[in-house]
A protein has these predicted regions:
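Short, flexible helix-loop junctions that flank or precede catalytic/ligand sites
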Residues: 1-196
């Protein structure tokens, strides 16, 4: 019958929705439809497989969307990770080693007090974790970042500009949750890439 994801998406657009949620952009056809819809003043939410927020921008460029279109249609780029939460039933404090702290980029001299981990219990099936929470990395599209996108800048340049504009990395967001006793250092290492 010739029904494809792209043709279905075009059919949805004929209904003139105010907001469009696209499960995932995997190819240039879907990306092209999403970009054109966003450029006509509609709000589009979608997902793209990438390691972090700057990588999402370069992924859209790699799919084949023109830099001026990518720069014009994005308002916010966000990366997220779901991390395991320490079980509240068996949560216990411990003093981290200087090596542990240094491994994730924390200054051992600045960390005061205990960090936490779960020792394992029946509530968490002896894992030390129960439930999940999200950590986020967001890039509001500032003028300077748009300019880099228009120029087809590489991922590192986009990342640096985003950091200069206050972006909190996934690792930094995770470490904030370590320091407030919600997740473990191991979860930060497992779920985030090492900062350069």
């Amino acid at each position: 019958i010739g029904l494809t994801f792209g043709s279905t998406l075009r059919s949805v657009l004929r209904q003139d929705p105010d907001v469009l949620l696209i499960g995932e952009i995997r190819d240039s056809e879907t990306a092209d439809i999403a970009v054109k819809f966003a450029l006509t003043g509609h709000l589009v939410f979608t997902t793209v497989h990438a390691n972090d927020a700057p990588g999402t921008i370069t992924r859209l460029l790699d799919i084949g969307i023109a830099p001026f279109l990518v720069g014009s249609c994005l308002n916010l780029v966000m990366a997220q990770r779901l991390v395991r939460r320490i079980c509240e039933n068996c949560k216990e404090g411990y003093t981290p080693t200087a090596e542990e702290l240094t491994l994730v980029g924390l200054d051992p001299g600045l960390v005061k007090g205990d960090l936490y981990r779960g020792k394992g219990c029946t509530e968490c099936r002896n894992t030390g974790y129960k439930g999940r929470l999200a950590i986020f990395e967001m890039i509001p599209m500032a003028r300077e970042i748009r300019k880099l996108v228009y120029e087809s800048a590489n991922e590192d340049d986009i990342r640096q500009s985003a950091l200069d504009h206050g972006m909190v990395t996934l690792r930094e967001a995770g470490l904030a949750r370590v320091l407030d006793g919600t997740i473990t250092i191991e979860e930060v290492i497992r779920s985030t890439v090492e900062e350069l």
